Amino acid sequence: MYIGTFHSLCLRIIKEHLEFTRLKKNFRTLDAFDQSYTVFQNIYRFRAIKNFDTAVSNQGAWKQAGEICTLVNNLSEELIDPAVLMADADVRIAALGEILKVYQDILSENNLMDFSAIQTEAYWLLTNYPDVLAELRSKIRYIMIDEYQDTNYIQEQLVFLFGGEHKNICVVGDDDQGLYRFRGATIRNILEFPNKFDAGECKVIPLVINYRSNSDIVDFYNQWMVTTDGARFRFRWRKFRHDKTIEPHEKPALHSPAVVKLSSENDEDEWHEKILAFIQGLVSSGKLTDYNQIAFLFNSVKHQRVTKLARFLESNGINVYSPRSDMFFQRPEIRLIIGCLMLMFPKYVQGLENQEYQFLTPEHYRYYRGCIEDANKYLADPEAADFHNWIRRRGKLHFGLKEATDYGYSGLIYQMFEFSPFSDILSTEMNVGLVDLRPARNIAMITQVINKFEYLHRISVLDPATYQGRRRVDQNTETPCGNAAGGRAAMRKRIRALYLKLLYDGGISEYEDDAEYAPSGCVSFLTIHQSKGMEFPIVVVDSLGNIPRKNTSDLMETVESKYFKRPAFEPYTDMKFFDFWRLYYTAFSRAQNLLVLTCNEDRRTPSMYFREVYSELIDMESDKFDINEFTFSTVKDVNLKDTFSFTSHISVYETCAVQYKLYKELNFTPVRVSALLFGMLVHQTIEDIHKAALRHEESLITDDNITRWFDANYTSLSKSERSYLAEPQRRAALNQILRYAERQSASWDTIREAEVDISLVKSDYIIEGKIDLIKGEGDTVELVDFKSEKKPDIFKDRERIDRYQRQLQVYAHLVEERTGHKVSKMHLYYTGEDTGVPTISFPYQKNAVEATIQEFDDTVHKIMRKEFSQTAQSPKACAECDFRFYCGR
């Protein structure tokens, strides 16, 4: 059974058949920021396109990068060929085609794949390789898609590709909750779905009974969808909505209305106080058992009105969960860590004082100076004297740096963890609330940010070497924060200069836990889009001053009419109204027991589009509303099982539970060290050999082909890992692979599967593993795990071999439980063994496997109980650990 999003399933299909795609191994998938940053790094290539300014607005490079990403994503998901656009007589469309081509070239040159390309590449694979499609269809007999109203053109194409002749396709959705037009989604997919089949083939089952909401709430959002359907608002639903009325499951015996308003009149302070009184009244009445029963929904949580309300509530003891409100860079722990980093580079601080960095705005100068002031204030405390002295020593060292350090910026951050307050923050117990853990999670996030900067710009140490008249350490210190100047070479420098500035401007979302969408002890502040699929006992809807706005461009409308595979479905003039009503229908329908519409009323708020429904509501301060009549539901648990593997979880926890907590629970990013490129290269090329054997193409397993596969893997690996092997190392790796192929040449037919991802669902968690090779004849199989090293001494290295044996025993358990195959033996194959027997073999012993699985289970439950006090016993493990400064080892 395949379970996942369209993107996750497409990514799985791509990885399982990578050799047939246009990608190379070790491709990198871009998130939204990475995509924009990649375009930004190459903006000079786009600006060199003839008539570029007719397709993209004349603004700053970063905003142009974002606009380009929006355009190419839309075009890609509609399967538009850039050559077709480039041939158009309209210079705007021709330029747009060139933009798409340049963008696709950049992805290809750098072995990158963006979010949209995941689906387009899977579609290309399945339509160009019928055998792959046939294999997939033979595995998939039934398809069920939820939220079908939010699918786009390419997703519809994929659904019917998967479905094939079986046509066993079930889609579920609510056309009134179609919110993702800006991502290419179209409501037509669900409205026209029955038309894809012959008469009588498609059964439509209306789902109109609502089991979530109080009947007043159901009546309210039913009325919302029809009250504004008329000439007064200049649009009608017509065929663009299923004609339906949602029916409540039952009508509670309440006299008080379940839909009310809470407002002030042109007085923001009064509005804050009324909301505070509302929440405090719920608590004092005993009706509220947890703040997480309340959710505030906004069009945007980044608006100053929203962040001011959040700060007001938090200042009055009410914790607010608002991970997308762009508060990350304002959190005290982040300001302190940035300020301390800057103090360790006095030349950069001097530049700030002299306002030398032309690409920083006054807002950025204020922010960085504020961070430095916060750091100086903290360090002035006598209790911070050790930390202060350490920063002074580092600043002096970096100011007069003569030779490269053995650390970069990430390394400096980890060194700071020796001192308070960072050491105290990292010591926070994992069983406390989300707000208490937020500082630790934010510090973990800043390690991710700095680590990615170092990766993108190939920085691993602080280097005093001079380049173009300046020390590299000074150039690199300026690059994450802001400084650069004109020309193409300078543009590259400018790109690096703006990294942290761009993140600051765009905002970073704080930690979100998929297993706890409404954290206990917090009121939730969410966007309406973010709340989709959720439900809350009490929902407070703000943003009532909002109005319908056009979200399409004239250029894209022209392209759609000429080149999209099907004409526009909804009238362009009505789209903004459709989207507006669907958005707020979604907001109103999140409420279970009580729906509150709130605003600070003024001349424009509520807007004319809400005024009628809003004016008819009872004010919650009215005698007609009695909170004591209500019983509020509790927030439902999200039953998501965590996944554990032996190598990534159990082995790490057994080595050091503290390290496990910091890396696996809090998601700190390790300081980037040289990847184990040698081992990866050997493994990937052996995988190529095995795949050829599994395709019954043993004739391709020749020294020449192996060398070609090896070279291709080395090229993609060195590019993705940003590290390289000297010629003797490459030759040694290739010799290991050729030796393996020679030794196994007579037994390729025994291979059953290679690089097997396998998982097993237990009662409260999931075990997973990746098996290098499964081979065998008859009714039994043998498991093989490859090690790209010489065979160890079985006596001196007993502990390491035992750990590998336990890993194989876990794999044996997974294979037997999932496939029913009997495992007879398990092998460690050492490709570096050039003279003797390259394997260490273990017989399958049921009692030993069961004992290992019991140990695995015990360790998992320690992790689930948040038992993270045990530290490493091995001095070697501590010496190699990034957290050695924090632990004082």
Regions found by a protein language model. Give the residues of each.
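C-terminal accessory regions
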Residues: 376-381, 519-520, 563-618, 862-880
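ATPase/helicase motor core of nucleic-acid motors
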Residues: 196-199, 257, 284-443, 447-451
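Helicase P-loop NTPase motor core
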Residues: 199-203, 209-318, 346, 376-389
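A basic/glycine-biased coupling hinge at the interface between accessory DNA-binding modules
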Residues: 1-120, 167
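Mg2+/Mn2+-dependent nuclease catalytic core
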Residues: 758-852
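Conserved helicase core region in the C-terminal RecA-like lobe
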Residues: 2-12, 144-147, 172, 498-555, ...
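Conserved helicase NTPase motor core
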Residues: 2, 28-39, 89-192, 203-217, ...
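Accessory C-terminal helicase-associated subdomains
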Residues: 93, 112, 287, 384-530, ...
